[in-house]
Amino acid sequence: LIYIIFFFNSNLLSEENKILKVGLLAPLSGPYSKLGNSLVHSLQLALEEIGNKEIFIIPRDSGFNNKNKLDIAIQDIKSQGVKVIIGPITHEEFNLVKEYNDLIFISPSNINPKFTNNIISVGVSLESQLLVLTEFIKKQKKNKTVIMFPKNKYSKLIEEKLSNLDLKNSKIFKYSSNPEVLTGEIEILTNYSQRKKSLELRKKMFEDKEDEQSTKELERLEQLYTLGNVNFDSVIIIDFGNNLKSVLASLVYTDVDQNKVLFTTINQWFDKSIFYENTIKNLYYPSINYKAFKKYNDNYYEKYKVYPNEITILSYDALGLIYYAWKKNGKIDSINDFAFKNKIKGKIGTFSFKDRKVLQELDIYKTDNNKFIKF
């Protein structure tokens, strides 16, 4: 394997102003070392694609939510004459890195997608996803949207994001992450009990009648599970993994008509299990460009014989963003050097930097015949 060259002494480099040194904060040891190594490998791929030998990566082990390790790693990177650092990978570590106001941090976190002090978050933000989803729902001529998300530590953050977006024709529905409780909550949302009763009452109207029309109507009703529509025509489910599968299963169980209700969720990084292991025929979600994502994964696998963690493509793009700023300005002095007026195209899609906010132009995807199709 070919690894990034580690430079431990900046004095070894001549013509310092012609060299771009980028730090990397990654968990290179401990339970998340696999992620850390994946980040290092992704930057190696980015370096090879850029093809400029004047760029050097200085990775350091920052642990995972380990303040002491993070602090030591930053100080070590800073001592090498580095101005811009890729990381930290979690939003919880932002408070510490803010103290290093003479450094610039490009984080793959998607929690706060904007310029915050000396940090730029370039993750696939909830704002970007919701903007794309609501526009998609509008184009499908749906106007009664339920935005669903679990009651957990992120609930308040999601509510704040939704409030800032001021989405119209929508209502919020928070649910339990416990599958046993969840089904009952969705029964209430979908008015399931009343729709079941309505069906039984309707069937009784025809049970004692023997005319052909009544017999046919009864046969039709026998094929149904409920009678009547739900009071929404679209859903946005802000959840992942097995929790998302449970929500989808509960919506199917409560007989939500998939021909009348549009099912959408947020970015799932093309997780095949989400789309192939649920009973929803058409599930839509916004994401980065699938072809670029697949090409990145295939190139990574060809080189390292394992597939990368999804977050690494964000770091891959972060290096490209740093390189662009460096080439455009001839140097990087402050976070303002990244306040581009024009849109920037990367692997994950197209970035725009408006009012110091970072937004991505995402595509809508669905599954069709076991394939991801751009809608």
Residue ranges and their predicted role:
Residues 2-6, 12-375:
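Extracytosolic ligand-binding ectodomains
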